Amino acid sequence: MGSLIIRGKRVVAGTHRVSGNKNAALPMIAAALLTSEPVTLTNVPDIADVALMLEVAKSFGVKVSRDAKTDRVTLTAAKVRTARIPSDLAAKIRTSFLFAGPLLARLGRVSLPPPGGDQIGHRRLDTHFAGFRALGAKAALGRKTLAFRGTLKGTKILLDEASVTATENILMASVLASGRTEIYNAACEPHIVDLANLLNAMGATVDGAGTNLITVEGAEELHGCTARVGCDYIEAGSYITAAAVTGGELTLTNVEPEPFAVLEGAFARFGVSWTIEKAKRKSEKAKGEEVEDDAEAWELHYVPKKKLKMKYDLGDAIPSIADGTWPAFPSDLLSILIVLATQTRGTCLFFEKMFESRLYFVDHLKQMGAKIVQCDPHRVVVTGPCALVGGTVTSPDIRAGIALVIAALCAKGETKILNAESIDRGYVSVEDSFGALGANIERKAS
């Protein structure tokens, strides 16, 4: 188990290129199984979860060509040799379950063990099952395997929750189903839009992605294409927070403006704001490749304020930040915002509605000197500013891990973060990225 050693009180400032969105890349990798032709994805992040997802794809016989330097991945599923995911791979990454929809659509069957991933709370799969059944698949649910089989037909499906992965799985299953499928109460996240754009580029007919009603006209077959993974606005929010708590000026490249409209209100509560502008630049076209001229043409600029101050509600009521399904504030940024609150003058209530175990990491922040009261598994009250002090902490999951990194960057002294591999699942080489921005951070093998 590796660790990160961070010596705090250094300004994080400069220019950082935001990676592609992990939550878009993973289902897009799974979608490549829907055709026998090559599918090329660009702007794919070089992170551990992507590597694991590609290993799962290879287990089906998919040929994978990856160029990490250009963030390009090409997948060719000419022949799918099995409909079963190896249990050892499924235990490592929860999104292995996203292969269920494509396999069911292409082969008419799928068998996989219960998925793994971060232990941030109970995440039900019932919505996936109900969607597959509605499309005509018959289920055989055992203790160690989840199996579905059948010929899929379009229908109307009302999801009992706006689950992102359920929406993705049912969407991928329905593109090769006969007839029309209507998915009500669909998730609206930007990565759903990225997936739909890929499917349409492959020859599918998907309308309404980004709204709570998605319609699909089933196709007989899909073909290969090239598609781009959208920007990781969660990574962007993490780096903005790191700059804010250390007093640095930051420019983020390779961003897209749409997701930040959802984030800006919550960040403004803490006195953090930014501007996004077009930065047209010349594209370098590699031989035989098509490059979108505007692919990286937006930049985000953050200029720090002298002091961070909480913006209270009318009547000086304590503000509350709650997560929810898009376009509510994303759960993946709540841990990061809690660290921002420790460095902001004022008090704020955080309400984690989606995962009952996500907020337990605040014990590590309290160990570092944060003034936090945990009301229950879903709510904490943070009062700032706090003078954080380094120590030894353990990263329990991706988002809590990066939150601890940010806390260490503004803490006095040295902080050792154990289980650094959990952070690698969602962030590209944080020691190099933050190091390039002025942080004193190094990785050590434990």
Residue ranges and their predicted role:
Residues M1-S446:
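Short, structured segments at the rim of ligand-binding sites
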